[in-house]
Amino acid sequence: MTKVAVEKEEPGVVYKVAGSLVIAENMSGTRMYELAKVGWNKLVGEIIRLEGNYAYIQVYEDTSGLSVGDPVIKTGNALSVELGPGILDNIYDGIQRPLERIANVCGDVYIYKGIDMTSLDHDKQWQFYADKKLKLNDIVTGGDIFGFVDENKLFKEHKIMAPPNAKGRLTYIAPDGSYTLKDKIFELEYQGKKYTYGLSHLWPVRDPRPVLEKVTGDTLLLTGQRVLDSLFPTVQGGTCAIPGAFGCGKTCVSQALSKYSNSEVIIYVGCGERGNEMAEILSDFPELTTKVDNEDVGIMQRTCLVANTSNMPVAAREASIYTGITLCEYFRDMGYNATMMADSTSRWAEALREISGRLAEMPADSGYPAYLGARLASFYERAGKVKCIGSPSRIGSITIVGAVSPPGGDFSDPVTTATMSIVQAFWGLDKKLAQRKHFPSVNWSTSFSKYVRQLEQYFDNFDQDFLSLRQKISDILQQESDLNDIVQLVGKDSLSEDQKVVMEVAKIIREDFLQQNAFSDYDYMCPLQKTVGMMRIICHFYAQCLRTLQEYDSRERKIGWGSIYNTLRPTINKITHMKFENPKNSDEYFKKYFKALEEEITVGLRNLMEK
């Protein structure tokens, strides 16, 4: 027994170095996905294959300078993240190293090799409030809430939970007061042994945190983007994909979601994208505020960034996705609605392809590994609305929004096709729309959402006409795409009057409803009340125009779209200017505004008929 223990303590030795993959020998006694420290600099690595005495380690730092014979230390632990107060308003790399604190220590633009620093600040004092319902000798299981920490003005209740694998009889709980992450908060006794716990705990990133059961999502994820909220809505706890070529606005859509969605926590993972995009978030987010108790509070206080840009080690891209989703699961277990932005899953798949190539695995389509679909599915499967373990009972959700960057905007790319088969909402971005400066460039013909039926009750409670208005707008856009072929062949003049109305109303929908300027004061986001009001006005105008044309046909007095346009030009201008209404206006204001405009359309067309 002693001999085995000594052998386990004996370090392994580097046998071969191939880019980010290191093969080490003398590694008996290790497990899959165990953390290893490679070389004299103690670079962080993870064991991804075991063959006899050899371990294949993917290293999350630059391996230049490693040589055969360097030591490899076995840690006995899996790659884990530290979960506790201080995660929000922070920026990490792919393996949860705090970049801001590292920059202060290094004083350089580059991270030093093998730097070892706690993910959370262990010296910062947090004000802890214990749960008064808990008594000594109570039986405690994983997920039970012991109290909460006042984290910041926007995220006031950071709940302190027992780790999912903890259980026992409560023998100590700290009174209200200021504590650091090093201090003992509660103590459990199980089978004669005592276990102490603090404000934070570790959890392996590859293991999904346990839940009681999954429940059906039935609440709309408000994005503030009209095209998404109206035509392709998604639920809190849903899975969405945003595929698109370069320059289509994927990052802009995911940033808009981070800024204005109705989630309580945002985890933004920049996985292999440009560093400037993360820098843009770091410069934009601190300026964005939201009102809390009549006080402006920075939106960064509900956001955590996991930055793994394209010039960082490729292997860490894979880890960054798992790090992000584990942070999300932690907030979900508190009973909050968390959203994870993965920008972009294509870069993650490319990292899988590179590591798979180094392992000499058989390549499948486009060189990606055969298990690409399974890995994507296991990642997206961690989304959902759930009943959390522990007491008191609570419901939380994780929404995953994954950007996909297919080369050349080709949606038949393996990553895009695998993602399409998994996700329930598909917001396909179109290069042609982007070139016409139509943003967000969501193609209404190729995109879809399977959540509409789940959201029926929600929309009925909000506005009974919503689903019929949504269907009507989809029909008008579909009719326009069918008529476009005729127009290109024989011109607009050959169309009948009602077809001309379809074309003109579809133009209003495209240019004045679906288009949205993310950088303007009036259209950076759109509340649902304004979206529904705009849909109602457009559909009402369309229905009234068709009714007027039909009545004139029966009276044998010809009237065309030209007459309607000339008579109602001021009203049509008002319809096209609806989006300029300030989104900060109250719901009551929007109801009055749209009611007056609806009346104006009805009266205008009635006067035209009476002439």
Curated annotation (Swiss-Prot):
Enzyme Commission number, as recorded: 7.1.2.2
One GO cellular component, as annotated: plasma membrane
Compartmental location: Cell membrane; Vacuole; Vesicle
Source organism, top-level taxon: Eukaryota
GO biological process entries: ATP metabolic process; proton transmembrane transport; vacuolar acidification
Major location (coarse): membrane
Matching Pfam families: ATP-synt_ab, ATP-synt_ab_N, ATP-synt_ab_Xtn, ATP-synt_VA_C
Alphabetical keyword list: ATP-binding, Cell membrane, Hydrogen ion transport, Ion transport, Membrane, Merozoite, Nucleotide-binding, Translocase, Transport, Vacuole
Assigned protein family: Belongs to the ATPase alpha/beta chains family.
Annotated protein name in UniProt: V-type proton ATPase catalytic subunit A
Lineage: Eukaryota, Sar, Alveolata, Apicomplexa, Aconoidasida
